[in-house]
């Protein structure tokens, strides 16, 4: 045998099993075995699969690498650490490749970014929204909500994006802007507080809601015509495509005590909503059909709850978020686990439970294309749950670590058959993680990892944002490794993809930094109502000769760049 540096299997003839009829003459059988005649479907004469891509030729040209899945994560620092006031993010929203981030600052509290196909982050513009601090935001899809649905007197011809911002005083602003040319403008303002007097009971003074304690908790698009907003315990639905005289009046308003979050069924029935809260039964979830009444699942049988001790049962159940994963399945967070319900089932029991055994789960996101459910908790862990085998699953555990092992003597037989290890940690958190607040210095009181915002990009990548304005982009890549060295093959003709060691940020060139727009139609108010927009993209940036600024560090600040400014018109019709 010729010596090579690649493995060569032993040349052994393997004859497939065949049925041979019994013959009386043994001599004929011996003669047939000694001849060179072979069965018609053996490897010697069956060449139907020789060109199949599944088979790989064991030679020097092909047997030099192997392909596996790896996690690729890129991080950007959206706000600098040298600022006198620390920027605390309040929400994040993504539509297609446009990313919107909001902070609790009085100025520059909205930033628009673009995630390119090369996984580069481009800052488009900075907007200052007047009023109280922003608590939640929502990018409305351009296809379903074009700005042209409003009169031409309220919008600019260049506007192509609508934004919803919820504030601490119960106000939701509808902003129209151009992603590349700026000129942001508030075209509608929805005051939720003036509709609460009819829904608040006068016999219970504690339910009296004042503008100081009425923050907008969540806003979400609804039925391609309007949006749903949550203020304290009240659920609002507005129709943006209705008559202009009735657009500021909600088409639905109801109070649900103890509600924490909601999710609209965006698959086939937008009139069906899932509600989670502290007063929706022991499981903390309810279904709201806008055409019928409220339904609360039955009490969960404690005997089937695996891994629940007495201390765990005595804790108050907390459900903070929910998400629809199909037209008939909804997932909700309950303390440190996830419950998946089938709304067609009548037994009052979840079809599957996912045990992360980390912190309290605070956010859920689902990727319909890959069938992956993402969860984030108060300890900073982000876990990806593979739900492709949901029909056969009863319990889900982590793939790695000691938390992936669970023993139950009473129901050990049941667990071994219906437990799937389907959870992978995407972002690892720590309960006592030290945070560098300035330069490389660490303060003793700067501990904890805070809240993680989750959202899905257009290509299925996961986007995370922590409370220190660190943006992360995570994706699963097919990576080729060299068999001999075990290193990643680069993309210079020898491999298809690889994990990059640096993140890139594209900004405008030096000539764009000194440009300032000063037109006559600008409008600004004094005090806290100074509304401005900094557009960092000029027409020169769209040219092909525009070079990107490449940073070698994985995290960096973009506040060093002097941005050009333009003032927003804050008049509301």
Swiss-Prot record:
Keywords: Cell cycle, Cell division, Cell wall biogenesis/degradation, Isopeptide bond, Repeat, Ubl conjugation, WD repeat
Additional record remark: Present with 3080 molecules/cell in log phase SD medium.
Protein's GO biological process: cell wall organization; invasive growth in response to glucose limitation; regulation of pheromone-dependent signal transduction involved in conjugation with cellular fusion; septum digestion after cytokinesis
Biased composition (Low complexity): 500-509
InterPro entries, alphabetized: WD40/YVTN_repeat-like_dom_sf, WD40_repeat_dom_sf, WD40_rpt
Name the record gives this protein: Protein DSE1
Compartment(s): Bud neck
Chain positions of cross-link Glycyl lysine isopeptide (Lys-Gly) (interchain with G-Cter in ubiquitin): 553
Function: Involved in cell wall metabolism and required for the separation of the mother and daughter cells.
Region (Disordered): 500-519
Induction: Expressed periodically during cell division. Requires ACE2, CBK1, MOB2 and SWI5. Expression is also increased under microgravity conditions.
Highest taxon of source: Eukaryota
GO MF: G-protein beta/gamma-subunit complex binding
Family to which the UniProt record says this protein belongs: Belongs to the WD repeat DSE1 family.
WD repeat locations: 144-185, 315-351, 356-395, 397-448
SUPFAM superfamilies assigned: WD40 repeat-like
GO CC terms: cellular bud neck
């Amino acid at each position: 045998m010729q010596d090579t540096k690649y493995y060569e299997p032993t040349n052994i003839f393997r004859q497939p099993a065949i049925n041979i009829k019994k013959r009386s003459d043994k001599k004929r059988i011996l003669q047939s075995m000694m001849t060179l005649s072979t069965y018609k479907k053996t490897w010697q004469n069956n060449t139907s699969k020789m060109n199949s891509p599944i088979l790989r030729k064991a030679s020097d040209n092909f047997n030099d690498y192997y392909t596996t899945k790896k996690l690729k994560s890129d991080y950007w620092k959206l706000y600098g650490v040298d600022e006198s006031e620390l920027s605390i993010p309040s929400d994040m929203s993504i539509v297609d490749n446009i990313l919107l981030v909001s902070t609790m600052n009085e100025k520059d509290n909205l930033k628009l970014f673009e995630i390119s196909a090369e996984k580069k982050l481009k800052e488009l513009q900075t907007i200052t929204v007047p009023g109280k601090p922003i608590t939640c935001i929502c990018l409305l899809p351009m296809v379903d909500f074009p700005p042209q649905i409003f009169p031409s007197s309220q919008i600019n011809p260049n506007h192509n994006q609508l934004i919803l911002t919820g504030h601490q005083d119960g106000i939701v602003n509808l902003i129209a802007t151009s992603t590349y040319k700026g000129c942001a403008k508030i075209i509608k303002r929805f005051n939720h507080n003036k509709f609460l007097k009819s829904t608040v009971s006068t016999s219970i003074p504690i339910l009296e809601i004042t503008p100081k304690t009425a923050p907008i908790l969540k806003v979400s698009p609804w039925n391609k015509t309007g949006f749903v907003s949550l203020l304290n315990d009240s659920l609002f639905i507005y129709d943006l495509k209705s008559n202009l005289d009735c657009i500021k009046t909600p088409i639905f308003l109801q109070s649900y005590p103890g509600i924490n979050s909601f999710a609209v069924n965006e698959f086939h029935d937008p009139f069906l909503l899932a509600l989670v809260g502290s007063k929706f039964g022991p499981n903390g979830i309810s279904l709201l059909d806008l055409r019928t009444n409220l339904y609360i699942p039955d009490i969960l049988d404690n005997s089937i709850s695996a891994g629940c001790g007495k201390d765990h049962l005595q804790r108050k159940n907390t459900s903070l978020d929910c998400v629809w994963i199909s037209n008939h399945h909804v997932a909700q967070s309950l303390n440190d686990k996830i419950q998946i319900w089938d709304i067609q089932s009548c037994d009052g029991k979840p079809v599957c439970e996912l045990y992360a055994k980390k912190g309290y789960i605070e956010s859920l996101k689902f990727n319909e294309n890959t069938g992956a459910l993402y969860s984030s908790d108060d300890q900073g862990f982000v876990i990806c749950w593979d739900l492709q085998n949901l029909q056969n699953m009863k319990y889900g555990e982590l793939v790695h670590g000691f938390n992936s092992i669970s023993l139950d003597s009473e129901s050990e037989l049941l667990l071994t058959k219906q437990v799937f290890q389907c959870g992978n940690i995407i972002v690892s958190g720590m309960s006592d993680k030290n945070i560098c607040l300035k330069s490389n210095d660490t303060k003793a009181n700067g501990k904890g990892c805070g809240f993680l915002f989750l959202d899905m990009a257009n290509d299925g990548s996961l986007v995370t944002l922590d409370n220190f304005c660190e943006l992360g982009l995570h994706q699963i890549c097919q990576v080729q490794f060299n068999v001999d060295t075990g290193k990643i093959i680069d993309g210079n003709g020898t491999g298809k993809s690889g994990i990059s060691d640096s993140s890139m940020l594209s900004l405008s060139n030096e000539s764009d930094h000194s440009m300032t727009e000063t037109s006559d139609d600008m409008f600004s108010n004094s005090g806290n109502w100074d509304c401005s927009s900094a557009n960092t993209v000029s027409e020169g940036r769209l040219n092909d000769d525009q070079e990107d600024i490449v940073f070698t560090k994985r995290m960096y600040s973009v506040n060093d760049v002097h941005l050009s400014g333009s003032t927003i018109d804050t008049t509301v019709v």
